[in-house]
Amino acid sequence: MPPRRKKKAAAAAAAAAAAAAAAGKAAAGKDGKAGIMTPKKPKKGKKKIPLMKYRVYIRRVLTQVRPELGISSKSMLIMNNFVVHNFQNIAKEASILAQYSKKKTITVKELKAAVKLVLPHQLLEYADRDGDRAVHNFESETSKKNSQGRKRGRGQQT
């Protein structure tokens, strides 16, 4: 009979140990370490897109046009929001136009059409003229750099 008592005692001790271990794990957390807090994983969802800040560029344009004038922080915030809002609207319209034409790339053609849809008439004229000038300057600069690189050859640039 003594062996039976040992089995009962061993079974009771094992049950008590299992209960204590389960209680310890519940108190400690999923990893089983008591007293250590593990950080929760961030929820996966839409990433917040940071808004661009155009303050520096707005100030540069202001000093070019009217160097004697300043701008308050509230006015700067309004101008920044205006620029961000217009860029977002133009980008949205350009992406819709690219989808209509079944293209994955937004080209100059889609951007021009989007600007025509978003901006009023007089702003459209200025934007169209200055945009054409900027594209022309960019293309002429890149063609100059490419032609200089070809004349000198590879590895011989100084």
Swiss-Prot record:
SUPFAM superfamilies: Histone-fold (SSF47113). Belongs to the histone H2B family. It is found in: Nucleus; Chromosome. It comes from Lilium longiflorum (Trumpet lily). The keyword Repressor does not apply. Expressed in the generative cell within the bicellular pollen. Not detected in other reproductive or vegetative tissues. Residues 26-45, 135-158 are annotated as: Disordered. This is Histone H2B.1. Can be acetylated to form H2BK6ac and H2BK33ac. Keywords: Acetylation, Chromosome, DNA-binding, Nucleosome core, Nucleus. Core component of nucleosome. Nucleosomes wrap and compact DNA into chromatin, limiting DNA accessibility to the cellular machineries which require DNA as a template. Histones thereby play a central role in transcription regulation, DNA repair, DNA replication and chromosomal stability. DNA accessibility is regulated via a complex set of post-translational modifications of histones, also called histone code, and nucleosome remodeling. Residues 135-144 have a biased composition (Basic and acidic residues). It comes from the Eukaryota. The modification N6-acetyllysine is found at residues 7, 25. Residues 147-158 have a biased composition (Basic residues). Its main location: nucleus.
